[in-house]
UniProtKB/Swiss-Prot annotation:
Protein name (Swiss-Prot/TrEMBL): Alpha-amylase A
UniProt cofactor(s): Ca(2+); chloride
Disulfide bonds: C46-C102, C153-C167, C376-C382, C448-C460
Chain positions found as Pyrrolidone carboxylic acid: Q19
Gene: Amy-d
UniProt key word Calcium: yes
Binding note for cofactor: Binds 1 Ca(2+) ion per subunit.
Signal peptide: 1-18
E.C. number: 3.2.1.1
Enzyme class per UniProt: hydrolase
Amino acid sequence: MFLAKSLVCLALLAVANAQFDTNYASGRSGMVHLFEWKWDDIAAECENFLGPNGFAGVQVSPVNENAVKDSRPWWERYQPISYKLETRSGNEQQFASMVKRCNAVGVRIYVDVIFNHMAADGGTYGTGGSTASPSSKSYPGVPYSSLDFNPTCAINNYNDANQVRNCELVGLRDLNQGNSYVQDKVVEFLDHLIDLGVAGFRVDAAKHMWPADLAVIYGRLKNLNTDHGFASGSKAYIVQEVIDMGGEAISKSEYTGLGAITEFRHSDSIGKVFRGKDQLQYLTNWGTAWGFAASDRSLVFVDNHDNQRGHGAGGADVLTYKVPKQYKMASAFMLAHPFGTPRVMSSFSFSDTDQGPPTTDGHNIASPVFNSDNSCSGGWVCEHRWRQIYNMVAFRNTVGSDAIQNWWDNGSNQISFSRGSRGFVAFNNDNYDLNSSLQTGLPAGTYCDVISGSKSGSSCTGKTVSVGSDGRASIYIGSSEDDGVLAIHVNAKL
């Protein structure tokens, strides 16, 4: 027993510190989840919008062949049939081209990978033409047979770690990641994506797999492909989906030695704050004091594709595009604050939580339509193209690693702070105006508020803020304004 534990510890140590670097290009920060976008459209978006606006990466939807389900719900992408790169988003050639084109403009690609399970019963035909028999645990496209799965049982008790990790999540056939053949197939799949130039992975349902098995899989992965601009010896950035709101048998701390985790507490807490259930003044110690994992272990977000639909964690407190004022405020705070690695959600609009992406014919995904103001139509929300969000990605890039300084609050729901002497933000979530002289920490001058507008040459399309020689400025945010936030930085100086 001692030997087995020692081997697990050695495996964990071998992986330690390798998976925490995002592999972002220099001077960039902020990832966007282009949920259900096609590969060709993502490539164009990298070149036309994400690259020029300072985004660092894209999380893409699952790349492997999935079960074709009636009505084509979004969640069919999470029911693997094989590891062939053939989905509604495109084929392997299109995927490879996208990765190459995005890397060429400094935007990294992170793949949502699924190897906890295979498709549930009913998933007999895949997007790449493969067939399967989930009822007999036969997936010839890999191939997997019943020998590669855990015994059939349901997860009914989240206080039983064995059940959570060895039984089936909502009927999805549960792979045995301790099986050496399964490990070989998973590593082969991930290594192929590394060869194609990806920078990392979001590991779906990591909580449902044993950390020791994941350590073995991660530890076997190739270094990143230097042909795509990665430094020699770079490892894939690993983000593990681990929902830990406390009170269950499985803790995120079991996974943070292996890679980052999806910090759902951040989503839940930021939703409560900007919905008015907690006061903004309490954000003064935002971070691990709120129960979050360490900053370099936390992928943070306002919402994700699951919890914007009431799945996952957070419930009714989660903010989504459907409450735009508060959503933009929460997103601006996330991007202005140094904690964690932020991921912006880019959604399609939905009224039914099973609804799939916009299509041209009920099956083929439609491309987003872009309006003159950068926003999207055609059923796509494109939060990443909202000025209040993409300008805050530029803010984050501008302030870099500068610390929070000059914190101010009114004892309620009005706050402001600077990031060193490079950026300043103020928020008003009270039902009365914010009208105060505040210390911005910035050099004297006139600045463009990048929330209400953008700098255009030597002018500003939105509000301007005059900072005096003492660093102070009169800050006004009316309670009835469209945006409850104001942001200025040194690259928006007029």
